């Protein structure tokens, strides 16, 4: 009911947690040299009035055609939300690819046991994960269920996801190197 009331096609606890992690990661990355100019070129100026933007979004909804540049309608509300939604969807997609590889599910471009978190090529990762998402949608439709990943990754969305991928792999200065870095 809440999902429908908010016009959200996917509303899960893990999605919410990943979205909030996106906000946290932004706060860690924004002071990093080079992050803000690239961010603003893709997402817009995060210094725009946040309260006004959210009030407008909840009053009027997303603008017509939001799908051409945003992963969700909510992402169109403000650059902060665009980043948080993009980061959350990147985490969804990496986990889809990683889970499929761990389960031995075959799809061209993804080897059994491959570590999707270590993938340095954002375009390759997004291609594989988007195809897996589509495959999952087909499988669940065969069972009469809703799509688990009902999103279209338009080229500007893929560009934002790739930007997030690059910065999340690099991390802020002083971040400890983890797998794939």
Which residues are covered by each model-predicted region?
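Residues at structural and domain junctions
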Residues: 7-11, 70-73, 77, 122
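Catalytic glutamate of the conserved HExxH
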Residues: 16-29
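Hydrophobic alpha-helical segments and helix-packing faces
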Residues: 14, 18, 77-80
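Post-HExxH zinc-binding segment in Zn-dependent metallohydrolases
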Residues: 26-83, 87-97
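Pan-zinc metallopeptidase signature
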Residues: 75-181
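Short pre-active-site segment immediately N-terminal to the catalytic Zn-binding motif
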Residues: 1-17
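Residue-identity detector for threonine
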Residues: 12-14, 32, 72, 140
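Short glycine/proline-rich turn/loop motifs
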Residues: 1-5, 64-71, 116-117
């Amino acid at each position: 009911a809440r999902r429908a009331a908010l016009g959200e096609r996917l509303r899960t606890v893990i999605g919410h947690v990943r979205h909030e992690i996106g906000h946290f990661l932004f706060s860690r990355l924004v002071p990093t040299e080079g992050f803000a100019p690239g961010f603003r070129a893709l997402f817009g100026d995060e210094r725009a009035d946040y309260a006004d933007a959210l009030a407008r979004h909840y009053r009027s909804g997303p603008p017509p055609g939001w799908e051409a540049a945003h992963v969700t309608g909510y992402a169109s509300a403000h650059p902060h939300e665009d980043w948080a939604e993009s980061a959350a969807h990147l985490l969804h997609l990496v986990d889809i690819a990683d889970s499929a590889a761990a389960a031995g599910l075959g799809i061209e471009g993804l080897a059994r046991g491959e570590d999707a978190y270590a993938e340095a090529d954002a375009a390759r990762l997004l291609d594989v994960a988007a195809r897996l998402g589509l495959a999952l949608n087909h499988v669940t439709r065969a069972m009469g269920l809703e799509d688990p990943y009902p999103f279209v990754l338009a080229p500007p969305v893929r560009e934002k996801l790739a930007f997030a991928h690059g910065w999340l792999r690099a991390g802020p200065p002083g971040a400890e190197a983890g797998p794939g870095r």
